[in-house]
């Protein structure tokens, strides 16, 4: 696990989604950037350690979701909200398992990364918007309230 919780500061549970078909390097890069930006802004965060999943800490499987839920439960008194970031399509079942099993009852924000028009080959394609639709649909089905970003990604 990696925890950078800061007493007296808002702390977020972070979920970085990925899916086997897509390039997990995109997820690794977004994870690094998101953690750095939260630290710069003075926020704390709780996220699976890079060694805990096959994709360097990104959420891909149901088992990853179980690990994440356990981690979030351990830090439930420090987590003020959950940020789900989708660098690519993401695997919604792992993400939903993490949030539902953690039972934190905190705000959930879902964000997806844009595709770049000149980078839609197999190594660079994100298709995160479609993943966001799937994740949000599952959150809705599970009765988990969430906030969507103003723009589609």
Labelled PLM ranges:
Residues 1-153:
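An N-terminal assembly and electron-transfer interface module characteristic of large anaerobic redox
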């Amino acid at each position: 696990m990696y925890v950078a919780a800061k007493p007296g500061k808002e702390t977020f549970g972070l979920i970085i989604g990925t899916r086997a078909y897509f390039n997990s390097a995109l997820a690794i890069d977004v994870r690094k950037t998101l953690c750095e930006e939260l630290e710069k802004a003075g926020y704390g965060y709780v996220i699976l350690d890079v060694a805990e999943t096959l994709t360097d800490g990104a959420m891909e499987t149901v088992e990853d979701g179980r690990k994440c839920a356990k981690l979030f439960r351990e830090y439930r008194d420090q987590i003020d909200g959950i940020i789900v970031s989708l660098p690519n399509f993401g695997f919604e079942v792992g993400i939903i398992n993490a949030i539902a099993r953690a039972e934190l009852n905190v705000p959930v924000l879902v964000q997806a990364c844009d595709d770049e028009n000149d980078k839609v080959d197999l190594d660079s394609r994100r298709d995160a918007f479609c993943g966001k639709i799937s994740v949000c649909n599952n959150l809705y089905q599970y009765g988990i309230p969430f906030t969507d970003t103003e723009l589609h990604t």
